[in-house]
Amino acid sequence: MAALTGLADEHGWRVVMVGDPCQFTAVGRGGMFAHLVDIYGGIELDQVHRFTHPWERDASLRLRNGDATVLAEYDRRARLHDGTAGEMETGIIEAWDQARCSGESVAMMANTTDTVNRLNHHAQAHRIASGELDPNGPALELDEQQLFVGDEVVTRRNDRRLRTDRGVMVKNRDHWTIETIHPDHSVTLTGRSGTVTLPVGYVTEHVELGYAQTSHATQGRTVDTRARVKVRTRRPAAR
């Protein structure tokens, strides 16, 4: 950050830093942005532009501020569903399939890595059963996943040495579609930033299925539809 602001000062650039204290906090130590605002001040944006429906725009602000009574509004509009973990996972896969078949971009979210892995497996299995993916074609075996041509994946590490045909570096949490799995197990991916071929070393360590992700990983994405599974483990009360 110091290097960036130093360059900006040298060349007369303007640096605009944007943050939201009500979003998920950093996994590690955080608080730097709030500290900067405390010292130098900031401008607060007070209008929401991201939602299509006015009711959801207003409800999102109440939810952001911790107003639990707004859940009744979501429930009234059939946005909340409950059931067993298995029922919820089946339901979210069905909703995901309906949304994407309608041409919508959709994000599946869950609050645990285990649930995310199961959703990714179910989504891939659904696409195999529907004939969208060929399990007998080129494939890549990872530790706990198998990747096929056409699978949706995410990259999990920034690497400035790997760039798309548009010159954009490969970044953590970028979303891609597998175009080609080469004999040497390198993989060609296509995403919003272009096409790139990743070496086998990067693929085996830093590529995974991307149909579902944790809520933290999905934060900041703009999609047409979101569906989220929250798994709650109940334990008997101590006596």
Would you name each region that the model predicts?
Residues 1-239:
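Conserved ATP-binding/catalytic motifs of P-loop helicase motor domains
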